[in-house]
Amino acid sequence: MNDQVASYASSGVDYGSLDPVKVAAQRAALATAPSLGQHGAQEITASRGESAYVWEESDAYRSLVIEGLGTKNLIADMMRPVTGKTHYDTIAQDTVAMIVNDLVVVGALPMVVNAYFAVGDGAWMNDRERANDLVRGWAAACEAIGAT
């Protein structure tokens, strides 16, 4: 294994650049919150910008989380030559666990878990073992938590 340093910064994640855009997006989205009223719903304003977004409908509260794989894939890709495994099955399970954690914080439980695979390039999926491990792990995690 080489001496690569895995960090958010080395993976291209610069919170100094990202955070102002996130704040601007939250402000712009807040201006659209009244649109929920067209559907008989209203946002729970305190949830905006938190781990899970919550809105109220006539019969229930609903919550939404979008979570990507993050930078765990960097570690998995470095470990694959050492272990011979992709580790993407466990990365998928960890990602679903983070979604559940974000939902539980607002008192919600998952019913549907959206698979958000932002791989940057379709060529990433050409590694069938890695892609299949990712899908298999995601499905196993959804089954374990009773969600689809």
Regions found by a protein language model. Give the residues of each.
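Glycine-rich phosphate/pyrophosphate-binding loop regions near the starts of catalytic domains
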Residues: 34-148
